[in-house]
Swiss-Prot record:
It is found in: Cytoplasm. Homodimer. Heme binds at H76. HAMAP family: Heme_degrading_monooxygenase. It catalyses: heme b + 3 reduced [NADPH--hemoprotein reductase] + 3 O2 = biliverdin IXalpha + CO + Fe(2+) + 3 oxidized [NADPH--hemoprotein reductase] + 3 H2O + H(+). Pfam families: ABM (PF03992). Keywords: Cytoplasm, Heme, Iron, Metal-binding, Monooxygenase, Oxidoreductase. NCBIfam families: PRK13314.1. Residues 2-94 form the ABM domain. The gene is isdG. The record marks W66 as: Transition state stabilizer. GO terms for biological process: heme catabolic process; iron import into cell. This is Heme-degrading monooxygenase.
Length: 107
């Protein structure tokens, strides 16, 4: 399993604009190898909002299949370029080495 994050610096007070874009079912949920998505808002930032989109995939090839799909291209075709509230962003890839799950409650 891999996790891919896209961490964006957003003009202060506008983090909700990016968060709202992900608060609906999209095409990524139908992609082979897609395991889930979380949208994270960093607490206690002073000068800007920081939003991280974290996606989980069976393999890097599955993520690459998503990025080459027509659905991805349509979702990321920002007319006029990147939205002006996004100051910067960084993509990171993580190999998942350990997964721990909660223990079932004792009966």
């Amino acid at each position: 399993m891999i996790i891919v994050t896209n961490t964006a610096k957003i003009t202060k007070g506008n983090g909700h604009k990016l968060i709202d874009r992900f608060n609906k079912v999209g095409q990524v949920e139908t992609m082979p190898g897609f395991l889930g998505l979380e949208v994270l808002l960093t607490q206690n930032t002073v000068d800007y909002d920081e939003v991280t989109i974290s996606t989980r995939w069976n393999a890097k090839e599955d993520f690459q299949g998503w990025t080459k799909s027509p659905a991805f291209k349509a979702a990321h075709s920002h007319q006029g370029g990147m939205p002006d509230y996004i100051l910067d962003n960084k993509i990171s890839y993580y190999d998942v080495k350990v997964v721990r799950m909660p223990m079932a409650a004792a009966q």
